[in-house]
């Protein structure tokens, strides 16, 4: 128990007169001090600081002096460097602190042994994270798992573009999300989440254009969109598993406006192109995967291409719908954050045999516009065009596969910050809030 100095200063004579009254008063009034004193069985340990933070003497309170006058021979002054018996510690934490401070590691008490091991583990983690060269299992290099990871992600493993992009944006995120398969528990909320919104908007666009005879007839596109939105919004809560919130009507109105602008701009952007495939899968079910040759061997890929268009010359354009607008530029492919578009272009040509892709773009649904990256005009180093984009993606795939099999998962926040949906966002020591 800690008795500290109050606002009163009493001389010795006053204390002798009032000491019994003070203790009687403490016992009679409800409060933690009275409760503790009343509950004493055989022993009571009272403590107080005798030095302030600046080193000056800490004056005792009149409560302390009243108690001390009754037991003058029981007062001991303990200094920090004094060796004390561990059984006199007030808590397991204090006992462990004393043992470490006195360089006496516990050998008999199992509880203290486990606590000491836990503290030592934490010290090793902290040292690893403070080191100039960030290596070891606590900095994303669990090298003891190399053999296991190499077997799990062998040449027979089926990859998706999103998993590759996960490693490309932050290797630690891939490790937590895919290798460890950890998920952050989310509190139930009203309304849809990001994934549900993306699925809903993808389905609306796919159904809007799939049912059209002439995808260039803007009026027909608008009428098709209106009918599809009415059906999809009515079924969305049940189909995607969310509970509509009080703003659901307003959200439908906002999404409707965005989708109308989206299809109008998409029709204009698609002059000379005709949709020939929607939600085209490869590497799923009976459809063969994309077999990509890399320096790490053959890599098997699967995916869903949102839309494939063809022009009058029989050439292909690959479209990938995105709900958000982050990381849709040329530099995101160069950095390895976005690999989907060139991989899907290669999948359309090689796995599906649909023809020769000459263009590809991300389409931002909510903004109603194309992303900055266009495969036909992509340029990196001395390479130009769609083949340059495919080769850039191939190099990233090789780097990623090699890193995964070598158990290299350093936490590297992507440019612009980390996504809030990263499963490690609650505890990652390198987490930087971003998009």
For each predicted feature, which ranges?
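RecB-family 4Fe-4S metal-dependent nuclease core
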Residues: 1, 45-47, 54-77, 99-435
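Charged, amphipathic alpha-helical linkers/stalks
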Residues: 85-98
């Amino acid at each position: 128990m800690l008795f500290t100095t109050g606002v009163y200063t009493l001389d010795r004579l006053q204390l002798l007169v009032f000491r019994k009254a003070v203790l009687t008063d403490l016992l009679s009034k409800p409060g933690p001090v009275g409760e503790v004193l009343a509950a004493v069985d055989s022993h009571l340990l009272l403590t107080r600081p005798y030095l302030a933070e600046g080193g000056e003497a800490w004056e005792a309170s009149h409560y302390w002096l009243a108690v001390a006058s009754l037991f003058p021979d029981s007062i001991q002054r303990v200094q920090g460097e004094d060796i004390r018996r561990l059984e006199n510690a007030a808590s397991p934490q204090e006992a462990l602190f004393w043992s470490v401070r006195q360089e006496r590691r516990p050998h008999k008490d199992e509880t203290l042994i486990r606590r000491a091991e836990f503290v030592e583990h934490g010290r090793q983690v902290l040292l690893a994270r403070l080191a100039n060269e960030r290596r070891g299992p606590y900095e994303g290099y669990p090298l003891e798992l190399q053999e296991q990871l190499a077997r799990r992600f062998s040449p027979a493993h089926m990859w998706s573009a999103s998993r590759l992009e996960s490693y490309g944006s932050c290797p630690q995120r891939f490790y937590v999300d895919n290798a460890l398969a950890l998920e952050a528990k989310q509190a139930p909320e009203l309304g849809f989440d990001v994934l549900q919104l993306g699925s809903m908007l993808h389905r609306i666009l796919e159904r809007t254009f799939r049912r059209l005879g002439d995808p260039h007839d803007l009026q027909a596109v608008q009428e098709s969109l209106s009918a599809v939105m009415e059906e999809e919004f009515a079924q969305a809560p049940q189909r995607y598993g969310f509970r509509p919130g009080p703003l659901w009507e307003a959200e439908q109105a906002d999404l409707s406006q965005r989708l109308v602008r989206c299809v109008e701009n998409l029709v204009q952007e698609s002059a000379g192109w005709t949709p020939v495939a929607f939600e085209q899968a490869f590497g799923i079910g009976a459809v063969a995967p994309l077999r990509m040759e890399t320096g790490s061997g053959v890599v098997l890929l699967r995916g869903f291409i949102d839309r494939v268009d063809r022009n009058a010359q029989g050439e292909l354009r690959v479209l990938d719908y995105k709900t958000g607008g982050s990381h849709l530029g040329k530099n995101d492919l160069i950095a390895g954050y976005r690999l989907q578009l060139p991989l899907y272009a290669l999948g359309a040509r090689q796995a599906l045999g649909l023809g020769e892709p000459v263009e590809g773009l991300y389409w931002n649904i909510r903004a109603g516009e194309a992303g900055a990256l266009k495969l036909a005009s992509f340029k990196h180093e001395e390479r130009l065009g769609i083949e340059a984009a495919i080769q850039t993606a191939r190099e990233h795939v090789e780097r990623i596969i090699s890193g995964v099999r070598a158990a290299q998962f350093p936490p590297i926040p992507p440019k612009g910050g980390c996504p809030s949906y990263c499963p490690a966002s609650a505890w990652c020591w390198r987490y930087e809030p971003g998009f």
